[in-house]
């Protein structure tokens, strides 16, 4: 279900682009262009709208096109998979570090660049955000419900066998641990 939603959301948001769409903003020199790569919606690395593969392909196209002088990464994302975000960030770092490419990547944050959205902006040469952009919070969240008190009240004693101390750390039947 989540996979189907991610696919739908990313298709609606325009993920899955594998080539540039050319838009003329100002008439003038045609040998100097700026590539715009969208990071819109959930950052994910699976399915037909694989954002990681698409962004890597667009960076490769930008690196080979001599008319492209810079890349703008247009971000409007709440984040997504940590591995996908890291892979995109790593691709940007490699693009920026390659002396043969020598083109800046600039992040432009839209309404939201949170978590993985902020993560992919971090290696960019410059980052621009609107004063109302929701941004920040690189990290991972893990949630669980806890039924320990309820189990005590109804007199049920769960038994769990594990091969290590933390194997069942998110079990809803264990007492909550305060870090």
What are these regions (language model features)?
Residues 1-103, 112-179:
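Small-residue-centered hinge/linker elements
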